[in-house]
Amino acid sequence: MRVRWLQFAVGALGLGFGAATEAIQIGLGVNAERVLIDFVVGETYLLGGLFAWGRQPRNRTWLLMVGVGLGWFVGNLAGSTDPVLHAIGIIFADLDAIFLNALILAYPFGSIEGRADRFVVATAAVGLTAANLLFYFTGNLAPNLVIGLFITAALAVLVPRRWWLAPPQLRRVLGPAVLAISVVLLAIGGLRTRHRPLGGGRGTGRP
């Protein structure tokens, strides 16, 4: 019962936080349809994580999904007129990408194994945040772009490699995910190269 109330509290917090940050975007004149799509994507991760929490609480994949869902909206704070919220929105704009990278490498058991996997997750967490901090003070996006492309390339190697080395039963589980992730990573890498750095800089790099 206590877990259910905690799930409800986290879900309510996530819904309220997401709605509040999307209101900031609407105030900036962002198209309502785009705001709605953005809201739905973030809440899908959040609610999916909460559902997984209820089904398999010992599998920490749910925690990473909730992290993606909540982190998805942090970059929206960059549009706030409050200087503190604005700074938070820029510096921590890549929280969703950081958690997503960890989620990709932790799937399906919820644990990150292997030095290379841990290195990529640590690089995403420290590197992207530091790059956003640099952008906040200098306006230079180049480090974020370089780190983002490195992470994209690393995942494009590590995820298929994990499938290749997995036993047959695990391959069946990883197969569809590997295909979907590979396509998404290639698309993201191409878009980042032309438009903005990986992780979105969701507050710093909204086109």
Language-model region placement:
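Alpha-helical transmembrane segments of multi-pass integral membrane proteins
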Residues: M1-P207
